[in-house]
Each structure stands twice: as C-alpha cells, then as structure tokens.
Amino acid sequence: MTPKTAFDLIFRRAVTPAFATPVDIGVAGGRIAAIAPRLESEAREIHLDGKLVLPGFVDTHIHLDKACLLGRCGHHHGSVGEAIQAVAAMKRDFTVEDVYARGAKVLERAIVAGTTRMRTHVEIDPRIGLRGFEAIKALKRDYAWAIDLSLCVFPQEGLTNDPGAGELLVAALRDGGEAIGGCPYMDTDPMAHLEKLFDLAQAFDVDVDLHLDFDLDPSWWHLDEVCRQAERRNWQGRVAIGHATKLSALPPAEFDAAAIKLARAGVAVTVLPATDLYLMGRDATHNVPRGLTLAHKLVERGVVCSVATNNVQNPFTPFGDASLLRMANFYANVAQAGVGEFDACLDLVTSLPARLMNLRDYGIAPGNPADLIVLDTASGRGAIAELPDVLMGFKHGRQVFERQKAVLLRPG
C-alpha cells in the first residue's frame, strides 16, 4: 500500500501486459503518475475488475485522404495499377473540404476503436497539389484532443517522372510534413526515386516510410537498395517499408536472409493485411496465394514490424472500419498464428508500431501520457482471440469515448 497521493484519476485493478497481476494506475496532469498493486487517493476511480488496459493502438500506415471513395469510382478494380489509376482520375476534383470530411469519418472510427497514435500518408503531386495536405493538417489540429496524427508526404504516382512533384514535396516538408514516403515501383527511374527521397529525408531530418515490393515476383526487388541507403546514410531505425508482399513469396532460406538484411539495416516492415490479401494473387485461377508477409516471423528474426489499416473503402480495399484490433485478429487468422503467438500479434498493433514510429513516450509507465484504452477481456491473448469491445478510451487522462456493453434481454 502506498501513501495517499494527489491523483486526478485512478484505474482500479487494471490488467496490463507488463504486470502479472492487476494493478492500480494513477493519473495526474494528463500523465501516468504511479502504478502499484494499491494506490491510496481520494481521486475519481474507475473500477475495471481485471479488464485489460493498453496504451492505445498505433496505426503506422493509413490513407485518410483517399478513404471512402467507393461511391465515386465503382467497384471493379482488380490490380494495384487499376486502383492507382482509379484514384488518380478523381484526385483533380478533390477539395480541402471533401478530403477533410472523408478523413474525419475514418479518423472518428479509428478513435472509438482505440487508436491513439497514427501516421497517415498524404498524396502530394501536381494533380491534387497541397489540398489533401492542408485538409489532413486541419484534421491533425482539430482531433489532437483524441489522437496524435503524423503526416507522411507521399508521391503515389512517381517522382522523377512527374514534373513538379519534387517541389510540392519540399513545400509540404517545410510546412509540417513529419515523414516522407515513396513508391519506387511507380517511377520510371526507381533508384533515382529512392535517392531523391533519402536526400530529402536527410535535408529535413524526417523518417522514410515507403510503399515497396508490392507484388509476388521475388526475382527482383528494391529492398536491397533501401537497406543500402539506410546503412549508407546512417538512417537505421528511421526507415519503414509497407506491403513488401514479395517477402511472402520467398522460400524459407531466402526469407531468413532477407530478415537478416532488414534487421541489420534497421529497416522496419508494415504488413497491410486487408489490402495485401485483396490485391495479391489476382492472376491465379485456383490455389490463390495469400500474398501476406508474416510479420511476426520477421519479428522473431529481429525486424521491427507492424500491422496497419492502409485503405478504407476505396479501390485498394473496398471495406474497412479502421479498427486495428480487428486487423490484428484478421492477420492472426490469415497468418495461421498459433495461440502461443497471439500476444505477438497484439504487439504488432501496439508496442512494435510505436517503435517503428520512434514514439519515445508510448506505453504504460510513470511519466508517459495517460493515453489508455480499456478492453472487455482479461488478457492480450483474449484481445486477439475474442475481438472484445473497446469499452473506453482516454487521451492525456481525459476520457474521449465510451462504449456501452450490449445487454441480452431475456423473455419474461
């Protein structure tokens, strides 16, 4: 038992991944002030009775600017290229207000599903200019009370082959872009594309987060060049690649070799199950490959990995609700994860993506922000197995949502 301390809020009997038995979590000034088996205080109390508390989900890869487009473009887009073309045809007509409204819809779904940190890719090119960027900046400002939103500026349709794209990227980086993305497989000169992006990353001191190796042909890839750039520029721990579905097509020995290379270069991998599964293997007539890279197996080999949302209700992924818990469960199903691997699957949407984004103040520890969510289960394993409700969420100690449990109404 601890002496009485001035807290603003105490969570009683919370289960957390770091403690074997339930603990009390004391919050003061928007931060976690103490964790102990029993805290004495006259503060407001929330009795959790052994429910799981997490420091919120972390979504490392989503596209808020092109979410919720299905009603505008039809549903017949079977390949990556067709999806890119469909969105490119619409971008010229995007307005700041339109991007804001669609992005807000998805952002609110993510918040009530327990996401507290998010990196969104924002397309920057001569078609849309900086309109999407301005809209997402406004979302970052307007929803800061509930979620930390980080902007990764991103030339979807290439860089060296798209006059004016480079200048727009620089303008966005000068105006608040916090990471730089890229898509070398869409550029006529992929190596120059990567060179330019790393130049900009160094010039503006930002992380690199790429779309990479997004097919199932393992005979060629850009992974080697990304690792080389990361090591040559001492950018280890500041580079991530999304999709990387080619890794799913490798035999075991080559998969192991790729993992060693990624770990040595400090290059992280983000797997995007909904999109990767939806778009890969489209040419197969039977025995269709999953096209899903096994992130938890890469983690076992020393690679930092995450599972993320990517797209929501657009040609790349015509469904989605921005729930990272659902995505982690989906990943575990498709990856055929064993029960003993469920905790590792939960790590892919919590602690590991926090490492990928270099979030130094993430986690349930004294001094960190009181960004907490409560799940209707008693363990991390249960979170993956059961898909429990996320009952409530807090940002800097302030409650931002609550979900009422369903009540069964028996007859009589």
Segments (PLM) and residue ranges:
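C-terminal cap of metal-dependent C-N hydrolases
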Residues: 355, 366-412
